[in-house]
Amino acid sequence: MIFSTLEHILTHISFSIVSIVITIHLITFLVDEIVKLYDSSEKGIIVTFFCITGLLVTRWISSGHFPLSDLYESLIFLSWSFSLIHIIPYFKKNVLILSKITGPSAILTQGFATSGILTEIHQSGILVPALQSEWLIMHVSMMILGYAALLCGSLLSVALLVITFRKNRKLFYKSNGFLNESFFLGENVVENTSFFCAKNYYRSQLIQQLDYWSYRVISLGFTFLTIGILSGAVWANEAWGSYWNWDPKETWAFITWIVFAIYLHTRTNRNLRGPNSAIVASIGFLIIWICYFGVNLLGIGLHSYGSFPSTFN
């Protein structure tokens, strides 16, 4: 009873903080000058991280098993993973570009998990026989950590594509503008060109940072995903007598692995780095959500215990 009450309190606290942080993010998005509000939102995410940690520990103690047995618990752990990835660059101060992605990801995931939409599966139950194994922690935690890192890295790649597209479009319009302007206002061309070059240099630096961090975060996520798939294969052999069954979840996890393996392969070729590899990562972003959420909508296969409740089907 005590753990249930504590879990209920932590859930409401985390949802309240998330709601406040979302409001602050919207305000800072509209008004960039409010620096103190941005700092408050960052601290709010850190407080949310500790609330989620307390929630997971409380649920673990009360249920007697690691809280990764259903969709609700996996969403909470996914939010915790986003928050963990967010905290590291926040304290380093020199990787703020990564925190711009991880912050909103943690906020939205935690907000969805604790909003009441998944009320039917909030209560922890007895594990199904297939999940009563020591491999639960190893397999599922590695998969969720892999999803979190791959999603963050993919979002950085999406941002890279957007900025690159806007940069190329402005380059086209600016070049035409300079040609027209040179016929009428020759003395202003040098000044405008220097301003344009400075702005273009800043964008180029930003694109390089996005490319740098997307590659490293995706590499980390790919490592987690590989460990998760391998440990899952060993667990499947123990539980079902076969390393691989081409279950919908397994199939899409394999597709996800292939897509990001292609991404990492493109990174070995200098000509394919940047926008080309970012396109592959952007495709991977969609594939991950199909693997994590889309397959759950089917509610079939050996991983059906992680599906939505019956009211959603």
UniProtKB/Swiss-Prot annotation:
One protein family per Pfam: Cytochrom_C_asm
One of the record's GO cellular component terms: chloroplast thylakoid membrane
Keywords associated with the record: Chloroplast, Cytochrome c-type biogenesis, Membrane, Plastid, Thylakoid, Transmembrane, Transmembrane helix
Keyword Thylakoid: yes
InterPro entries with a match to the protein in the record: Cyt_c_assembly, Cyt_c_biogenesis_CcsA, Cyt_c_biogenesis_CcsA/CcmC
Membrane topology per record: Multi-pass membrane protein
Domain of life: Eukaryota
One Gene Ontology molecular-function label: heme binding
Transmembrane parts of this sequence: 9-29, 44-64, 71-91, 111-131, 143-163, 217-237, 244-264, 278-298
Primary localization: plastid
Stretches of the chain forming a coiled coil according to its record: none
GO biological process: cytochrome complex assembly
HAMAP family: CytC_CcsA
NCBIfam families: cytochr_II_ccsB
Subunit structure of this chain's protein: May interact with Ccs1.
Function: Required during biogenesis of c-type cytochromes (cytochrome c6 and cytochrome f) at the step of heme attachment.
Designated name of the protein: Cytochrome c biogenesis protein CcsA
Taxonomic lineage of the native organism: Eukaryota, Viridiplantae, Streptophyta, Embryophyta, Tracheophyta
